[in-house]
Amino acid sequence: MISAQNLVYSLQGRRLTDNVSLTFPGGEIVAILGPNGAGKSTLLRQLTGYLQPDSGECRLFNKPLNEWSITELAKHRAVMRQNSHMAFPFSVQEVIQMGRHPHRTGNQDNETAQIMALCDCQALANRDYRQLSGGEQQRVQLARLLVQLWEPTPSPKWLFLDEPTSALDIHHQQHLFRLLRQLVHERQFNVCCILHDLNLAAHYADRVVLMQKGKVIANGKPQDVLTQQALTMLYGADITVLKDPANHSPLIVLDH
C-alpha cells in the first residue's frame, strides 16, 4: 500500500499540492486527471520519493519514503516521467537493460527479450534511442520500468506513469492498457498514471482522482467521478457525458 497524508508543497508562493491525502491499497489502475497546472506531476513526484513535501508524509508499506534506500525503493516502484531525453548514443536494448541497475545480478537476456516483446520493442533493439519517435521512446521506457520490477518479490510492485500515452498511436494506447491490466491481475503490479485522455481513464481505470489547483476534488470509480457536472466545472469546457454501450463506462464527448 502507498499512502499520502496531508501533502503540502509550495513553489514561489503557489501551492502545487494543498493538503492532499490519498490511499492506494493496490490491485488497481488509478488515473489522476485534471487541467494543466493542477498539481498532478508534483503529486506523482512526492508519491515516488523524488520530491520532499514541505509538510505531510508519503509511506510505502507503512514505512516513510524518506526511510527507504534508493536501491530498495527502486525494487518496489518504477517511474516514467513526461520527458525521457538522453544525451548519449545508447541503443534501445542498452536503455532497457538500465532497469537492472538496482539488482545485484547482471542483465537477464531472456527476461529482457520477453519484456521487449511485451512492449513491442523487438524491432527497435539496435537503434539509437535518440533517433526514435516520441511514441517509440515511451514504449522503450515502459520496457525499462518492467525490467526494473520484473524480479519476483513477496510484496506488490508499483508503476507510476506520467502521461504514458501522450505520443502513442491508438493501437499502442490500447496495447499499453491491456498490458497494464494483465500486469495488475497476473504479477501483483499496481498502476498510478496521469492522463489527459478522459475516455482512456473512463475505459481502463479502476479508480479516478480529479485534481484542481493542488487539491483532490474527487476520488472514486469512473462512473461516479466522471460526471458531466464535475468535468464541466473542472475543465471549463462544453462537454456531454454519455454511457458507453459496450461496457457502460462514461463516454465523454466535446460539444460543437
UniProtKB/Swiss-Prot annotation:
UniProt-annotated binding residues for ATP: G34, P35, N36, G37, A38, G39, K40, S41
Major subcellular site: membrane
Gene Ontology CC: one annotated term: plasma membrane
Keywords assigned by UniProt, alphabetized: ATP-binding, Cell inner membrane, Cell membrane, Membrane, Nucleotide-binding, Translocase, Transport
Gene3D superfamilies, A to Z: P-loop containing nucleotide triphosphate hydrolases
KW Cell inner membrane (keyword) present: yes
CDD domains, alphabetized: ABC_Iron-Siderophores_B12_Hemin (cd03214)
InterPro entries in UniProt: AAA+_ATPase, ABC_transporter-like_ATP-bd, ABC_transporter-like_CS, P-loop_NTPase
Protein EC: 7.6.2.-
Domain called ABC transporter: residue spans: 2-238
MF term (GO), any: ATP hydrolysis activity
Pfam families xrefs: ABC_tran
Subcellular location: Cell inner membrane
Summary of the function given for this chain in its UniProt record: Part of the ABC transporter complex HmuTUV involved in hemin import. Responsible for energy coupling to the transport system.
Summary of subunit composition and partner proteins: The complex is composed of two ATP-binding proteins (HmuV), two transmembrane proteins (HmuU) and a solute-binding protein (HmuT).
Recorded family membership: Belongs to the ABC transporter superfamily. Heme (hemin) importer (TC 3.A.1.14.5) family.
Protein name: Hemin import ATP-binding protein HmuV
